[in-house]
Amino acid sequence: MDGKPQVEVIVNGQVVPNLDDREYRLIKLENDLEVLLVRDPETDNASAAIDVHIGSQSNPRELLGLAHFCEHLLFMGTKKYPDENEYRKYLESHNGISNAYTASNNTNYYFEVSHDALYGALDRFAQFFIDPLFLEECKDREIRAVDSEHCKNLQSDSWRFWRLYSVLSNPKSVFSKFNTGNIETLGDVPKELGLDVRQELLKFYDKYYSANIMKLVIIGREPLDVLQDWAAELFSPIKNKAVPIPKFPDPPYTDNEVRKICYVKPVKNLRRLDIVFPIPGQYHKYKCRPAEYVCHLLGHEGEGSYLAYLKSLGLATSLIAFNVSITEDADIIVVSTFLTEEGLTDYQRVIKILFEYIRLLDQTNAHKFLFEETRIMSEAQFKTRQKTPAYQYAHVVASKLQREYPRDKVLYYSSVLTEFDPKGIQEVVESLRPNNFFAILAAHSIEKGLDNKEKFYGIDYGLEDLDSQFIDSLLHIKTSSELYLPLANEFIPWSLEVEKQPVTTKLKVPNLVRNDKFVRLWHKKDDTFWVPKANVFINFISPIARRSPKVSVSTTLYTRLIEDALGEYSYPASLAGLSFSLSPSTRGIILCISGFTDKLHVLLEKVVAMMRDLKVHPQRFEILKNRLEQELKDYDALEAYHRSNHVLTWLSEPHSWSNAELREAIKDVQVGDMSDFISDLLKQNFLESLVHGNYTEEDAKNLIESAQKLIDPKPVFASQLSRKRAIIVPEGGNYIYKTVVPNKEEKNSAIMYNLQISQLDDERSGALTRLARQIMKEPTFSILRTKEQLGYIVFTLVRQVTPFINLNIFVQSERSSTYLESRIRALLDQFKSEFLEMSDEDFSKHKSSLINFMLEKHTNLKEESSMYWLRICDGFYDFTRLEKQAEIVSTITKDEFYSFFINNIHYEGENTKKISVHVVSQRCEDEVYEIPNVTIIENGNMFKESMTLSKAAFPLKPFDEIDRSLLFN
């Protein structure tokens, strides 16, 4: 014996995707902690995650939110590392991030860090599960943080719907409990009961945080033996308390909770019908996953489906069907249908049609064939799965380890269906009975009967029994001939082959393979990931794009009409790993198609042909126009971040339209206008395109040529090709634009503090801006969020508003927006003094961390494609921008950086160009702080017109001067 902690090797290796070149070893430490070690010699970042098999369902009823509070306070220092910011500072100085979440049955903690800093991060991470301090002085602050997190969800319909599922459940069930926690449940209630919340938290931690119900994943470059030694050394001290995994015998729904309908008025302007079925637990049925299979059929959107029939009748626009595991013994299936006005009026007919389809499922003998298609695609997706960022992989796999999968096939069985289980499928279908569901009907027009109020979200709702005669009619329903099971899926790929060739010199950027008056085509044959997939982007650039608000909403409506017309055709493609999206751009319409190359060309040609041949059906037009009008109205209920983001874009770009302008414009868009509009939009087009993946240059040319021929446009003159420009904020400019939140129930205000720095082609300023964000992000978070408790959402980011690079600070809070701006100014004052005191070592660490981030390799094809397309769309075509800026960062001195900060970021800087967007809650309008030397923007359009426009974004080099020798590493 050498004194090392004992380790049991459970299994070497895992069944993995074809392209997964990592090494795996599953071990168990002497304290019963199961650890999956993953060696990835190519990873830039290392990671670890611990999943604890305890979540919100284990909260004591007198301390709701305690598990979530534990997740928060756990990070506030340990005996070995008592500084509450030590962990975060270590990660930030090594290009790291961390996060955690509390779910109903588990709590998951994870981090990512530069590969060479893994041991130090593991040491700090392990201490949270060995000897956390749960500092008394942090207690109240973190209760407020939990409360702030809850407050940000108060006006979220998704959170409110989920809470209603709980409210309508069996009151004896753990599912009925409020999970998040707030200042009442963690502050006021414990005081009233004479409870010390910190002492109760210590009891909770001591009772449940045991090594035997934890799962750990470690990903690093080091050999497995080294990772194993680190795991044993650092994590064996976690105590094993032999804790049993909690069981929850009370069912979430009994006969008392079904056959009811709940009426609720949502925050957003939506019309939604949720049908919820309690079903037997599916936890142990991972080989077939019967409920998942049944949801696949209920949520199908192809020919003969429930949704297709509803759409043909003008009753619905979309739906989603899903199952949720509530406890080990109980699941629910939810069919959530988004209704038209007619569907809302006749919602009982919608329910009847659902039960017609369920009857079809009950009578069919085709499940084996349909299941086999699903199984084939799950296998294909698993075999061709690419890597994801290390932290994403670690925390997902850690939660999967909690399941009872065979230990050498944890990754496989969590992804692939393997066994057809007709009895299991029938058991689920038989649970979808007319006497075994409850409904939630939500719409803005619902006013009467909302005589119940939910305590924690303030949801007003009504509840009544479903009519017994209606239930009886569902028991004797017959299936319409319009409903039938899915046909054979023509998009299932036959070939998953990739001709993998040795590559000595990898392509660094895409190659320009066609550039004429009709098409500019960039192509890169994948030489890194070797998957049988591709990503294709086409920007159909039109001279009339964004010409007016009416053109803008008409373009959006046109893309929606195409997607709607192709819904039944394209849905099977999505099941077979092929997806497309159409979205309006500042210059036209962008088509993105991604997936297996075997059938990608078929979908591409179908979509482009529909763009050309679309026949606008008046009923579908009115339904989709109404839906878009609802979305524009829902801007009033938009989260503060998205609202401020939209306003900043509108203020910055000459052809960006305000929500009010778009709302007014859509009123004038009529079905009779669309034919001429489509003709005008497509008459002159230039196709800017990128093909990246498992396609040769010849394949790429043929793909884009087919799109061009289908549209057959006239060329766009060079003078008609608009390029991106933005307003120039004058040096020394200090502007505030205020927008009041119309929703009177919204407690939160917010500020987007935006600093316009330089044009994107100014590489040195870009490097300095990124370094500023690197240095500022941790102190901004720890000061504004942790210490000052301004709000749950606090971040800094580098933002691109072409052609400019910007630095943003965002805070959402229950305090007023002027107070938030005053605290950001105080923060900048603090930075000003602290930068002078920063050691050379700390400055060097920040530079190294940023350089590591900027030089990170892409982890999958999508990441790489998205970066190329972003560089194409910004108009500079600078595919190596980050690499060049990384070189510049290495040369930046403290003096240069300090001068840059003082002149360009501090609010008194002579070159500082600042616009802050204030999103103002009506609940805190009275709290006003004076901001000196500021100009209030009273009228956004007049402000834009008074500003000088930037020069347009142009390629760094003329296209005919691109040197092919520079394309390679």
From Swiss-Prot:
The Gene Ontology biological process annotation of the record reads: meiotic cell cycle; mitochondrial protein processing; peptide catabolic process; proteolysis involved in protein catabolic process
Which of the seven top EC classes does this enzyme belong to?
hydrolase
Q: What is this protein called?
A: Putative zinc protease mug138
**Keywords in UniProt for this one?**
Cytoplasm, Hydrolase, Meiosis, Metal-binding, Metalloprotease, Protease, Zinc
Cite the SUPFAM superfamilies for this sequence.
LuxS/MPP-like metallohydrolase (SSF63411)
Q: Name one GO molecular function term.
A: metalloendopeptidase activity
An example Gene Ontology CC term for this record: cytosol
Family membership noted in the UniProt record = Belongs to the peptidase M16 family.
Identify the residues that bind Zn(2+). 68, 72, 149
Under the heading Gene3D superfamilies, the entry gives: Metalloenzyme, LuxS/M16 peptidase-like
Q: Which residues form the active site?
A: 71 (proton acceptor)
Q: What are its E.C. numbers?
A: 3.4.24.-
What the protein does? Answer: Has a role in meiosis.
Look up and give the organism this protein is from: Schizosaccharomyces pombe (strain 972 / ATCC 24843) (Fission yeast)
Subcellular localization is given as: Cytoplasm
